[in-house]
From Swiss-Prot:
GO terms for cellular component: cytosol. Belongs to the cytidylate kinase family. Type 1 subfamily. This is Cytidylate kinase. One of its GO terms (biological process) is pyrimidine nucleotide metabolic process. The keyword ATP-binding applies. The gene is cmk. It is found in: Cytoplasm. It catalyses: CMP + ATP = CDP + ADP; dCMP + ATP = dCDP + ADP. It comes from Caldicellulosiruptor bescii (strain ATCC BAA-1888 / DSM 6725 / KCTC 15123 / Z-1320). InterPro entries: Cytidylate_kin (IPR003136), Cytidylate_kinase_dom (IPR011994), P-loop_NTPase (IPR027417).
Amino acid sequence: MKKINIAIDGPAGAGKSTISKLLASQLGYIHIDTGAMYRAVGLKVLKNNISPHDRKKIVEILNSTDIQIKLVDGRQLVFLDGEDVTEKIRQPEVSMYASDVSKIREVRERLVKMQQELAKQKGVIMDGRDIGTHVLPNAELKIFLTATAEERAKRRFLELKQKGYDVDYYQLLDEIKKRDQNDMTREFAPLRVAEDAIVIDSTSLSIEEVLQKVLELFYKVVKNEV
């Protein structure tokens, strides 16, 4: 079966990574979570006590920052300056830093180059905010996965609670709304639906139902690509 690239975009907490991982497992594809790369930059900024709005210092620190994505047993690991930060970048305080640094053109340009290199061999499922519109505009299948802000906050709340974090639902809801605003209004590569993307609203759907919809679309595209 011919391999294609799949772009999955959408706002924070829409379930992009969950669906991408399941899809990659079923298809034998490689999953690349681009948000993890921005989180790694956000973590570095946070660790160095730099304001997420200090563009000059962030660009300076970026030049001495080494971010690597490694795939181990089908799982994506993120390394920041040689340290495995796969779990650390999921800390709640890193989220807003990631959103702020992602607005900086120089940060996006550097990470987009990395992302495009990773997708050259095909057979890649890449999720993020600007994959179908900017990173992989020629991806054979583009999905825009969304849900209400309230539903996304609820999912994130349950996920973080399960990991042992002490979080407040209303604070998470506020952060998600702010991230949506940041993502949609940033000057460079904002969050938007690609013209040829298929929109899936997962608000009232289970993970299995969303996965089934995406698989049906995948097989339809692959059939036409032969």
